[in-house]
Amino acid sequence: FYASLKNEDGLLKAGTKLADAQVSLPFYQPFVAEVQSSSVVADDAASLLTLTAGNLSVGFDKETGALTSYKEGSTELIKEALRPNFWRPVTDNDMGNGMNKTLRPWRDAGRQAKLLSMKQKALGKEAYEVVSHYKLPVGESDFIVAYHFSGKGYLDVNCTFIPGNDTLPLLPRMGVSITLNKQFSQMEWLGRGPHENYIDRNTSCLLYTSPSP
């Protein structure tokens, strides 16, 4: 809902928005047919572990422990492997408190993570688990990524961060990043915006859908 000026008022032109609000409405959720499950077949080569279920497959590099491939048939989705990521875009407030300098060690921590172990095991005939354990260069911290691939083609990714000590610099964020091939560019973001929406600017941010540039 919007409230705006019907007529010009001093310096404010007609149509100037004065207030806005959003309310939640019930939404229709279409029926989605249940996906049939298939057996998960593992191809454990010297440098690559490939798991296949039906026409879907995922691949893991044994040297890095990273997810490097996700295919539907012959179509590859991934351009750059999934990796830990502890950095985010710097805001004006961040620049003011020097965050881009004091927290800089986290910027490349994901790329510099060293693989300690990569464990794999079948969970019955229709599921497989891969767990990659990394040591981070910041404070000797640990980062564990657990992948669960099911016979329905679902890939669940769970991450665990274990701080190495109590004196680590503040963590800008904790997550992973991945780069898809360029044909997968039609993405949309549902969230608050369009400007930054930290707690000091959250009221003016409404939920909206924004397409990728």
Please annotate each region the language model reported:
Residues Y28-S210:
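Beta-strand/loop-rich accessory regions of lumenal/periplasmic or secreted enzymes
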Residues D9-V32:
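Short beta-strand elements
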Residues F1-L5:
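Short, aromatic- and glycine-rich surface loops/edge beta-strands on solvent-exposed regions
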